[in-house]
From Swiss-Prot:
Name of the encoding gene: SEC23
Keywords: Cytoplasm, Cytoplasmic vesicle, Endoplasmic reticulum, ER-Golgi transport, Golgi apparatus, Membrane, Metal-binding, Protein transport, Transport, Zinc
SUPFAM superfamilies with a match to the protein in the record: beta-sandwich domain of Sec23/24, C-terminal, gelsolin-like domain of Sec23/24, Helical domain of Sec23/24, vWA-like, Zn-finger domain of Sec23/24
GO CC aspect terms: COPII vesicle coat; endoplasmic reticulum exit site; endoplasmic reticulum membrane; Golgi membrane
Protein's UniProt name: Protein transport protein SEC23
Residues binding Zn(2+), per UniProt: 63, 67, 86, 89
Source lineage: Eukaryota, Fungi, Dikarya, Ascomycota, Pezizomycotina
Predominant subcellular localization, coarse grouping: cytoplasm
Annotated source species: Pyricularia oryzae (strain 70-15 / ATCC MYA-4617 / FGSC 8958)
GO MF term set: GTPase activator activity; zinc ion binding
Residues annotated as transmembrane: none
Membrane topology term: Peripheral membrane protein
Subcellular location: Cytoplasm; Cytoplasmic vesicle, COPII-coated vesicle membrane; Endoplasmic reticulum membrane; Golgi apparatus membrane
Keyword check for Mitochondrion: no
GO process annotations (BP): COPII-coated vesicle cargo loading; intracellular protein transport
The family this protein is said to belong to: Belongs to the SEC23/SEC24 family. SEC23 subfamily.
Amino acid sequence: MDYENLKEQWSEVEDRDGVRLSWNVFPSTRMEASRLVVPIGALYTPLKEKPDTPLLQFEPVTCKQPCRSVLNPFCQVDVRARLWICPFCLSRNPLPPHYKDITANAIPPELHPSNTTIEYRLSRPAPSPPIFLYVVDTCQEDDSLNALKESLVMSLSLLPENALVGLITYGTMTQVHEIGYTECAKSYVFRGSKDYAPKQVQEMLGLGQMPVRPGMQPQPGRPMPMGPASRFLMPVSQCEFQLTKALEQLQKDPWPVANDRRPLRCTGVALSVAVGLLESSFQNSGGRIMLFAAGPATEGPGMVVSSELREPMRSHHDIDRDNIKYYKKALKFYDTLAKRTAHNGHIIDIFAGCLDQVGLLEMKGLSNSTGGHMILVDSFTSSMFKQSFVRVFEKDGDDNLLMGFNGILEVLTTKELKVTGLIGHAVSMNKKSTSVGETECGIGNTCSWKMCGIDPTSSYGIYFEVAQGGPSHAQPAQKGMMQFLTYYQHSSGQFHLRVTTIARNIGGPAGDPAIAQSFDQEAAAVLMSRIAVFKAEVDDGPDVLRWVDRMLISLCSRFADYRKDDPSSFRLEKNFTLYPQFMFHLRRSQFLQVFNNSPDETAFYRHVLNHEDVSNSLIMIQPTLDTYTFDQEGGQPVLLDSASIQPTHILLLDTFFHILIFHGETIAQWKKAGYQDQEGYENFAQLLQQPKEDAMELITDRFPLPRFIVCDAGGSQARFLLSKLNPSTTHTTGAYGGVGAQTAQTIFTDDVSLQTFMDHLMKLAVSGTN
């Protein structure tokens, strides 16, 4: 089967099951697997929206303990004996009595060959409606605070009627607003400089009295008997007026700030009070703590910088030199808080609206461990914030929020495979099973992970190894299988279970060409990028780049055709040709190169990469570039190369985080002269309009909203484009500073070009000594 057909097949599987694998035929031995270089991995989007996934209104049929796999199309069913055989543990299970009428032609939906992904609506109701607790920074200028208040008031109308909402504001002090008290505005105040233990928070808020009685089953539709926390968290339908009033009356923090100081801001206390409030009464009920930070924490636990302006925020350089006063202590504080929050089943979203850093680097664990969002904007007045914030509350066709709470993902494998770990926004459930591997990749040593927050685009990299071989005379299996079970609280108030079961052939003896043909270079590039970013969090930058290079050289020397020590004979098959260039762009990307980015930006970019699926991640690693000219209709894809910059062309660059329209030199001059407004130049006006329309289309379903930039050749904003292009025409190419560089853009850089990179790669791959 040729590569184009295979790609189409993989994309159909992705649409149906939300899965892309690095290898679509599995090696038969551990030895063979180690020679593949790229691990067997799956990029899985559990809640991928697909209208045709059947939603079954009954409990799933499961295998006996400890296996608990779910009945699926790959099970053998003996209709006469009313039995089914589990492909994972090979146990025989009786079919339930109500399946007595099934025949070979009349089978239940979960056994239908096309239903490899299926969803069950379980009878277990959620313990309470979803909770939204707004934590608002009041140390900000009036225009920014007013814009934020508007967005928050508007968001109340997007929440389900029964959702519980609450409000905490903070500056020098933290205030918990008692919205259940209607006589006047009333709030509980916590000192910003003090570290409160969970018990103290609960006592001060008077939450210790009435724990929910164990064994009391919540009834769908009937509200839980509310404890003392109902003074702070109330259904939107009951408190919308009161909360709107409280939000509208918010004012800038009254504490005076000297000219040479930052405002005193106790972000750490505000978050730990929010976590304590939800922890006391709503453990393992779906809820979001939404933090709106307008600057860095300068006071109390979790402070990231002092209030003196002469002390700058830490940079990557400071961190490398260990010149960091608050970093380790703050990181420890937020990581402990993140563990607590994840254990309680709650989500923390961070919305940072500030030109300076707010401390995302220290706080990143809060969102990364709980599946929360992280949005980085210059100000809450920007449309980037307003539109991204609205998208958090998007709904499906049945008017339910497109967000799941308290998810648990469990992975089962047949005996040939073992799971080594997961990279994505989750925490380990420390669950051991026969499916758990010996090695560890990402969050390992478990077959089950907890995702407090999960949405239809949340994607997880799951990595596998081949099990140690059994006796050599044993009959090798024909197929290796995996089953992904995702339990989560649906926003309609019930628990759901999404089941995806996939099977792939197992290759023949060593060197089976089917394995090489089954390599999906796009999925592999994204899975390897996640490992590289995971390593970059703990290792030095240069070490990670060396690891990326070593892996690429090994892969090429294993799968390319060449004569030893002859680089000119080097050839890669079609399904490997793009992989080296993905790695070239990954090495230069902001995920691994921190130069020119603040530590907060690096934390943000890495957070988003670990959330997205294959196609979006590839745009981040290797942005797309389209060109628009008079002699063609619409945009045409061109190489991400400095040679693509031409004076009479318009370029549209999509890096996922930025969408940029670049006018070549001549186009920019015509535009400046106003030709587009003159009669007879309608085609020029049309040419200027076309990339804008295409850019708007790209923005429509993107989250977080990308920054939109329009710039001209020679303008300062053009740096966003130049930094992404392969520098094939630099000030050093060609004699006298570049022959042939009259038309293409000269890029002033010491970075190697893709061509030089490939030359070195070929040389190293064909020399048997790598």
